[in-house]
Regions:
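Active-site-proximal loop/turn and secondary-structure-junction residues that shape catalytic pockets
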Residues: 58-60, 114-116, 144-148, 169-171, ...
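Conserved mixed alpha/beta catalytic, RNA-binding, or beta-rich assembly cores of soluble enzyme
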Residues: 199, 203-204, 213-216, 223
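Mobile, glycine- and charge-enriched loop segments
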Residues: 48-57, 65-66, 70-79, 126-133, ...
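Core AdoMet radical
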Residues: 77-96, 100-190, 198-203, 228-233, ...
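Auxiliary Fe-S-binding modules of radical SAM enzymes
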Residues: 1-31, 95, 223-325
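Conserved, mostly hydrophobic/aromatic
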Residues: 15, 40, 69, 165, ...
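N-terminal pre-triad scaffold of radical SAM enzymes
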Residues: 35-78, 88-109
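Catalytic cores of alpha/beta
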Residues: 148-157, 209-221, 278-290
Length: 325
């Protein structure tokens, strides 16, 4: 066993946060995957036990986005199946929430495409969110793009429990992926949501040409923001997007990244989200041993996921416990 990995892991297990030089060492190791996984699992078990959180999402508004995120099929700038905007009715969203609840999913997310939401859409959500909570009895999360503090306050007052807004990548690499808004707009959205009392679900996407330095930068930025959950998405190359020709990530590389993020963010939830099925393939169950504590189950926004029933069975087979409240 690599003694330096063990020493760094013991530091984390004793309650300390690791420094950048230690993080860079962990990222530099070529043959330490199994040691990383072993210790990441120890860190997960100490801070989270064997509990796993599950959530499902529904696209309240899909496609037709004005922004140019190079990985995203929903941008109107690229020739994909989602150039036109499709908006679900309140009843369709309620039906999706009922289905999620029936399948045993305790957290239900509503996600809107686009840079932000209009006043009309916000007013609609102020009525819909409490209806979902009170009539169906399920926790409601949301991702509605770039919002300000006052909008976040209104969502919190309506009963939204957590706001999803990803950084996507590091500040340095962001300009290579998005040009229609800047990194600070995302940072300010996260800070405003936190100030309003909303929980934070903030992570990014991997496999988009970023370096290990970018991955470290994003992890440290997330740590500084003090978020509650870090969704880790892995590129699902979509034909027609600028990144549609990139290769998918290898399962072992993904497990390595999950483990490294567990070292950096020992007490923060880590959710394996978009691209899980395509990229991890037969190694999906290993994500928990690598330090993950949560999964996005069911379909994603523009790609197929895995049935909730299959995920619940996987969690049970591993001797883990799905949190159903």
């Amino acid at each position: 066993m690599n003694e330096r990995i063990a020493d760094i892991a013991e530091k984390v297990l004793n309650g300390s946060l690791i420094e950048r030089n230690e993080i860079e060492y962990l990222f530099s190791i070529d043959d330490g995957l199994w040691d990383l996984l072993y210790w990441a699992n120890q860190i997960r078990q100490k801070n989270f036990g064997n509990k796993v959180k599950i959530c499902s999402i529904v696209p309240g508004r899909l496609g037709g986005c004005s922004q140019d995120c190079k990985f995203c099929a929903q941008s109107s700038r690229y020739e994909t199946a989602f150039q036109e905007t499709k908006t679900l009715t309140d009843e369709q969203i309620l039906d999706a929430a009922r289905e999620a609840k029936q399948k045993g999913v305790p957290h239900f997310g509503i996600v809107y495409s686009g840079k932000t939401i209009s006043e009309k859409e916000l007013a609609k959500l102020e009525k819909l969110i409490p209806k979902i909570k009170n009539e169906i009895g399920i926790s409601v999360c949301g991702g509605f793009g770039i919002i300000d503090y006052k909008q976040a306050q209104r969502l919190a007052k309506a009963g939204l429990s957590r706001y999803n807004h990803n950084l996507e990548t590091s500040r340095n690499h962001f300009k290579n992926i998005v040009t229609t808004h800047d990194y600070d707009a995302r940072i300010e959205t996260v800070k405003g949501a936190k100030k309003a009392g909303l929980g934070l679900c903030t992570g990014g996407i991997f496999g988009i040409g970023e370096s290990d330095a970018d991955r470290i930068d994003m992890a440290l930025q997330i740590r500084e923001l003090g978020v509650d959950m870090v969704p880790m998405n892995f590129l699902y190359p979509i034909a027609g997007t600028p990144l549609g020709g990139l290769a998918t990530m290898q399962p072992r590389e993904i497990l390595r990244l999950i483990a490294l993020y567990r070292f950096i963010l020992p007490k923060t939830g880590i959710k394996v989200a978009g691209g899980r099925v395509l990229n991890l393939r037969d190694m999906q169950s290993w994500m928990f041993y690598a330090g993950a504590t949560s999964i996005l189950s069911g379909n994603y926004l523009t790609t197929a996921g895995r049935a909730v029933e299959q995920d619940l069975k996987m969690i049970s087979d591993l001797g883990l416990q799905a949190e159903l409240i």
